[in-house]
Amino acid sequence: KIAVIDGYYAYTGGINIADEYANLIVRFGHWKDSAILLEGDAVWSMTVMFLSMWDHCAGLEEDFDRFRPPAAPVRPWTGYVQPYNDTPLDPEAVGQSVYLNMIARAKKYIYITTPYLIVDVATNTALCNAAKSGVDVYLITPHIPDKRYVFEVTRAHYPPLLDAGVHIYEYTPGFIHAKNFVVDGRFATVGTVNLDYRSLFLHFEDGVWLCDAPCIHDIERDFQDTLTLSEPITLRRFRHLNILLQLYRSILRVFAPLM
């Protein structure tokens, strides 16, 4: 999701162009999402991402410099902002690398919101190891699903994480579609990358990595506000599941790389 206006402003995040994203219609309860607005030099990175995709789809080879606007004054800013994109045409899994790097940097806490939790072994291991090492790892996922089978696979991934000490909450008012990480109040990312195989390895995605930027406090505050509206999930709940539901989830996990 990329929107660039005149080369001076850029938006990205989880928000698509559809009525439910603005809660103009209700499909899965309250739709909770996030996005980030960029100004300044970082906008050029988003412009190049869009133009690269445009040229790939249209079979063009344009001179991108003609789309670069004259420099404009921007507000004083502290910290670092780095937009990034991920593409299946490149063997490097950029989105996964960003997430794994952030998890590895954590000393105190990790706050994550994701609509889907269908993680590969590396990501699952990183989250579990962080929790076992004393880092407070908090995950918020939806309580009302948009895709039932994906929801069941997401829940099938809960037990190993809960057993390692990861705190998992479900957003009870509806469907949370935000894809955010916050680490120790110093690092954050907002973008389109879900914690699932398709998003990490098969889709065209993008995001913005932040370090010591003032808006990180806004992202963290939004997480805390969302947490108050979410229900904690306990491991005990999964130890007494209906055997047929356990079998159903186990079968679905086999197809996790396709989800």
Q: Model-predicted segments: where are they?
A:
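Charged, low-complexity intrinsically disordered terminal segments
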Residues: 1-259
